Amino acid sequence: MSIMSYNGGAVMAMKGKNCVAIAADRRFGIQAQMVTTDFQKIFPMGDRLYIGLAGLATDVQTVAQRLKFRLNLYELKEGRQIKPYTLMSMVANLLYEKRFGPYYTEPVIAGLDPKTFKPFICSLDLIGCPMVTDDFVVSGTCTEQMYGMCESLWEPNMDPEHLFETISQAMLNAVDRDAVSGMGVIVHIIEKDKITTRTLKARMD
């Protein structure tokens, strides 16, 4: 068994028209044993910028803390909010530094540029190789299921409500077909003027 699937979990981000969405499941378990149903996998990295971390739970928390530390230093030094593309480089550097004994987590970044409000999503592998796309990115133990749902449901230029419905259906149906993720879903819809966070009920088994 891969160490990446030891704790389970799923994270997904999607791009809409002038908005992005990021979603994650809420389960923390040890293989098939369920521990808690409110585990945080999505972390704010700015006013309109979030990172989702799927993988080994200890490394999820370690990477989130170390990234927040680097982010605070950056914002103190630069005196401005970080851009999504710069955050991607920061995460890539953090992961690649440990490439010979990597953090077992594959991050997903979603947000809007602080000046232009241009939507941005990307994913990275566990040694920090980035992939920037214009539709959706997925990470976690049920990537095949998530890709299948996203390929079926995603459309270009979705408004925030349509985007919420699409990412919610994709996540809920994907995690239902994976034994080590699920237990509810949390969704953040990021727009120019507001961020909407919704928690979805799912099958609790």
Swiss-Prot record:
Modified residues annotated as N-acetylserine in this record: 2
Annotated positions of the N6-acetyllysine modification: 77
Gene3D superfamilies given in the database record: Glutamine Phosphoribosylpyrophosphate, subunit 1, domain 1 (3.60.20.10)
Annotated compartments: Cytoplasm; Nucleus
GO CC field: cytosol; nucleus; proteasome core complex; proteasome core complex, beta-subunit complex
Highest taxon above the source species: Eukaryota
Protein keywords: Acetylation, Cytoplasm, Nucleus, Proteasome
GO biological process, one term: proteasome-mediated ubiquitin-dependent protein catabolic process
Assembly notes: The 26S proteasome consists of a 20S proteasome core and two 19S regulatory subunits. The 20S proteasome core is a barrel-shaped complex made of 28 subunits that are arranged in four stacked rings. The two outer rings are each formed by seven alpha subunits, and the two inner rings are formed by seven beta subunits. The proteolytic activity is exerted by three beta-subunits PSMB5, PSMB6 and PSMB7.
Family under the similarity heading: Belongs to the peptidase T1B family.
Protein's job: Non-catalytic component of the 20S core proteasome complex involved in the proteolytic degradation of most intracellular proteins. This complex plays numerous essential roles within the cell by associating with different regulatory particles. Associated with two 19S regulatory particles, forms the 26S proteasome and thus participates in the ATP-dependent degradation of ubiquitinated proteins.
Protein name as it appears in the record: Proteasome subunit beta type-3
Lineage summary: Eukaryota, Metazoa, Chordata, Craniata, Vertebrata
